[in-house]
């Protein structure tokens, strides 16, 4: 959990929930598969104006955090609901202003976990997905099932970084909300683009302000 630099007790703040990618190693990126490596939430806000929480994929029965795969999807979804409630109760997280984001596995999880049932689907004001999407076929995230999940989305907007508009179109049409696509130009499977001020990251920050009603920092 990251409280913004301008956090004050008693105030309300938009809430960013972020899921990490899998564990993997490439010359350009070492992904641990753990939530402490998440970076998108910081890139969205530069550390001000919103609470940012990175979540694990969990299996309660095994007592483990899944570095690869979903863990237990039902447990992972229930944990997210509990965290959003806790952030609202204890830290001023605005339950009407929650943005779900993720990279790679985490991007798929926006739909596969975040729209798993009506209870969790009701949380989200908006989605941001980076370099993958629900419906690309990974670990049960088929296009047919993703379209079904997309019908549960009750938010107002979706933003994609480094995804193909054509490939995502069936899910986009099912969600039926304004959707933005940008290309970062990073040329690597990584979240490094969110740590600088390239055009795609600045566009994401403007979008976040628009969907949450925040102030430009």
Spans of features found by a protein language model:
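Active-site machinery of serine-nucleophile hydrolases
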Residues: 15, 19-82
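A domain-start/cap signature at the N-terminus of enzymes
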Residues: 1-15, 50, 170-178, 214-217
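Structural recognition of the beta-strand scaffold that forms the well-ordered cores
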Residues: 15-19, 51-56, 97-102, 110, ...
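Soluble non-cytosolic domains of exported or imported proteins
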Residues: 10-13, 70-78, 104, 118, ...
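The feature captures the conserved acid-bearing segment of alpha/beta-hydrolase catalytic domains
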Residues: 119-208
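Extracellular/periplasmic catalytic domains that process cell-envelope and extracellular macromolecules
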Residues: 8-12, 43-48, 93, 119-122, ...
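Gly/Ser-rich "nucleophile elbow"/oxyanion-hole loop immediately N-terminal to the catalytic nucleophile
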Residues: 5-11, 65-104
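Short glycine-enriched nucleophile-adjacent loop
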Residues: 107-119
């Amino acid at each position: 959990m990251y409280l913004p630099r301008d956090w004050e007790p008693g105030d309300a703040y938009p809430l960013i929930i972020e899921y990490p990618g899998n564990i993997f190693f490439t010359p350009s990126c070492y992904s641990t598969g753990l939530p402490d490596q998440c970076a998108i939430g910081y890139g969205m806000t530069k550390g001000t104006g919103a609470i940012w929480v990175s979540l694990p994929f969990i299996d309660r029965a095994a007592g483990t955090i899944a570095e690869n795969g979903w863990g237990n999807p039902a447990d992972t979804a229930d944990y997210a609901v509990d965290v959003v409630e806790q952030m609202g109760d204890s830290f001023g997280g605005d339950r009407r202003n929650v943005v779900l984001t993720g990279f790679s596995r985490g991007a798929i999880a926006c739909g596969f976990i975040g729209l798993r049932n009506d209870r969790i689907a009701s949380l989200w004001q908006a989605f941001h997905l980076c370099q993958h999407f629900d419906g690309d076929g990974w670990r049960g995230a088929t296009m047919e099932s993703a379209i079904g999940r997309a019908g549960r989305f009750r938010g107002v907007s979706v933003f994609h970084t480094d995804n193909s508009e054509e490939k995502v179109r069936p899910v986009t049409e099912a969600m039926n909300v304004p959707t933005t696509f940008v290309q970062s130009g990073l040329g690597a499977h990584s979240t490094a683009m969110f740590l600088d001020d390239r055009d795609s990251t600045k566009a994401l920050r403007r979008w976040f302000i628009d969907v949450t009603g925040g102030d430009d920092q």
